[in-house]
Every structure is written in structure tokens, then in C-alpha cells.
UniProtKB/Swiss-Prot annotation:
The gene is smpB. This is SsrA-binding protein. InterPro entries: SmpB, SsrA-bd_prot, SsrA-bd_prot_CS. Residues 137-157 have a biased composition (Basic and acidic residues). Residues 128-157 are annotated as: Disordered. HAMAP family: SmpB (MF_00023). Required for rescue of stalled ribosomes mediated by trans-translation. Binds to transfer-messenger RNA (tmRNA), required for stable association of tmRNA with ribosomes. tmRNA and SmpB together mimic tRNA shape, replacing the anticodon stem-loop with SmpB. tmRNA is encoded by the ssrA gene; the 2 termini fold to resemble tRNA(Ala) and it encodes a 'tag peptide', a short internal open reading frame. During trans-translation Ala-aminoacylated tmRNA acts like a tRNA, entering the A-site of stalled ribosomes, displacing the stalled mRNA. Belongs to the SmpB family. Keywords: Cytoplasm, RNA-binding. One of its GO terms (molecular function) is RNA binding. The keyword RNA-binding applies. It is found in: Cytoplasm. It comes from Methylococcus capsulatus (strain ATCC 33009 / NCIMB 11132 / Bath). The keyword Zinc does not apply. Its main location: cytoplasm.
């Protein structure tokens, strides 16, 4: 349940809801995607999944791996779609150099958080994240349960 389909016409395409459970998100960035035509059509239909995807820095460039864009049956016949191909992310040079430094030296990781439309272009929100330990996950769950219980009591009382 880590990717969520959006209603047709809304800006949100897919979310990686599992990322906030697995990581502390320190910083959020917006990146463009290099896509093929059939991928854009799939995104417009809401056929994207970020569940097991990750961002990797290679040769001074950011790449999205493991994201699944399901091809539409009406896609072009002369194109062989690869649903899980690696996709290049478009970031400014300063952002890339800063991210490379933080990922390599400080032990952070880059996690895709959500995929959405902005002014007719597909954008990916990536998070600079630090992994949670098991006790951190338990504490976060306990905090979430307490907030929910507090809201329940406030509504009744």
C-alpha cells in the first residue's frame, strides 16, 4: 500500500507512503524526469508505482531505479516499453554536488517520495533521508497512536 493512485485530473500521480515509515526525511527536493512518450501517457492514466524505487547518484547524475510505469495497451506498437527502466532525474548542478557530498560523506540516502504534475510536466519529489532503526519506528507508531487517541477524546469530550 505504498503507492496511491490519484483521481483523474489531480496533480498527484503516485506516493511512496512507506518512505516516511522507513526513513527520517531531512530535506525535500523537486526533480524533473526524462521520460519517453509512452511513459507520459501511463502517468496521465495514473499507472505508476514508487513502492520499491530508489534514487542513485552515478557519474555526477541522479537516476531513478525500480519505479514501475505500466505501459498502456494502446501504446505504440513499434516501441518496446520497459516498465522498470532507469530514468534520469533533472537537477541543478549545485543541488547535485550538494547531494553527492551529503550522500557520500554523511551517510544519507535519496528516496523518491511522490510523483506529480506541475505546469504540465512530471516532477518527482525526492527526500534526503536517514534510515530509521526498529526502536525509532516503534516510537513513531506509538506517537501516531497517541495523537489519534487524543483526537478521539477531544471529539467526544
Amino acid at each position: 500500500m505504498s503507492s496511491k493512485k490519484s483521481a483523474p485530473g489531480s496533480a498527484n500521480i503516485a506516493q511512496n507512503r512507506q518512505a516516511t515509515h522507513e526513513y527520517f526525511i531531512e530535506e525535500r527536493l523537486e526533480a524533473g524526469l526524462v521520460l519517453e512518450g509512452w511513459e507520459v501517457k501511463s502517468l496521465r492514466a495514473g499507472k505508476a508505482q514508487l513502492k520499491e524505487s530508489f534514487v542513485m547518484l552515478k557519474n555526477g547524475e541522479a537516476w531513478l531505479f525500480g519505479a514501475h510505469f505500466s505501459p498502456l495497451p494502446s501504446a505504440s506498437t513499434h516501441v518496446q516499453p520497459d516498465p522498470t527502466r532507469s530514468r534520469k532525474l533533472l537537477l541543478h548542478a549545485e543541488e547535485l554536488s550538494r547531494l553527492i557530498g551529503q550522500v557520500e560523506r554523511k551517510g544519507y540516502t535519496l528516496v523518491p517520495l511522490s510523483l506529480y504534475w506541475k505546469q504540465g510536466r512530471a516532477k518527482l519529489e525526492i527526500g534526503l533521508a536517514r534510515g530509521k532503526k526498529q526502536h525509532d519506528k516503534r516510537a513513531a507508531e506509538k506517537e501516531r497512536d497517541w495523537e489519534r487517541e487524543k483526537q478521539r477524546v477531544m471529539r467526544r469530550g
